[in-house]
Amino acid sequence: MKYNFDEVIDRSNNRSSKYDERLKKFGTEDVIPLWVADMDFKTAQPIIDACKKKAEEGIWGYTSRPASYFEAVQEWEEKYYGWKPETSHMSWCLGVVQTMAALMKIYTMPGDKVLIQTPVYSEFYDIPEAIGRVVVENPLVEENGSWHVDYEDFERKVKECKVFLLCNPHNPLGLVWDKEDLEKMAKICMENGVMLISDEIHSDLIFHGKKHTRTATISKEIHDYVVTCVSVTKTFNLAGLQASTTIFPNLRMKADFDRYWSSMDIHRNNAFSSVAIEAAYREGREWLDQLLPYLSANFDFVKEYCEKNIPQIKPNIPDATYLVWLDCRDLGMSNEELRKFMIEKAKIGLNEGYTFGRSLTGFMR
């Protein structure tokens, strides 16, 4: 099937937070909302068909999770990432952010320290702080527009932490970590008894010939220290259905995690996410294979447009995710001036860079 990603869809009346929250977030509805990882494309037709079939049943009671659900995850992992995690080591959760919050609540105490690499997805700050943990930053180092790990700083700071939250691939920089970096970070965590939680939600969205490596696959020793968080909700634009899969290194941790959610009676997919997620894994690849070059062409357009028309803004073209990190420092604006400029002059609603790294000035995503 040929998909039309050029189709413009009016989302102003479909209860989209991306559009409906413009006034609250930007003080005006007169902006193009580009502030959340949410595409404006219809999802794959097999997913739509699965949801239509479920809707037509007319009964949406408590939902079971058939064995085929996690088997679909397993088959995707084996086919595209070269590993075959046991389905018995998988747990459902509402989302990757909720998974990270739960794991920190289960395995750390208030006041414990959590390591993050900035600039990074703002929830990596917000969730630990909301539950009383202390965030420790290992700032990524920028050199000539590329970013890398400061390992001396990483090794020093990880010693005082209980958890390392890894963004793999990295949001907002679009970094596809190579195996050597992943191995080095993971070994340092292992040597210091630090749990490594790997957020890999953007791993299906890879460009420019890069290849994603699951952190847990580097070695058997590293596997035993890594909790892997995956989901196809970003991949197929299904975030509103709330579903992710957590892959544990052992059954003990899975049992701890399942017990935590069961204590709140939160352990079932909703009726539509159950069928939609399985359809995505089993029948969505054709759509994804057409999406990726379309997104890559969008990146080319952004790069060429900025170079030609606004050279003061330098886009960091990502190798992963569909998000672009903008270096606006040459505009010479404060963070507040830059925010106002984007809203009032450019008429676009973006994320301020300082929410990804609190000491940063002059960046947007």
Stretch-by-stretch model annotation:
Residues 313-314, 326-365:
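Conserved C-terminal alpha-helix-loop-beta "cap" of PLP-dependent enzymes
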Residues 49, 220-296, 304, 308:
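Conserved core segment of the aminotransferase class I/II
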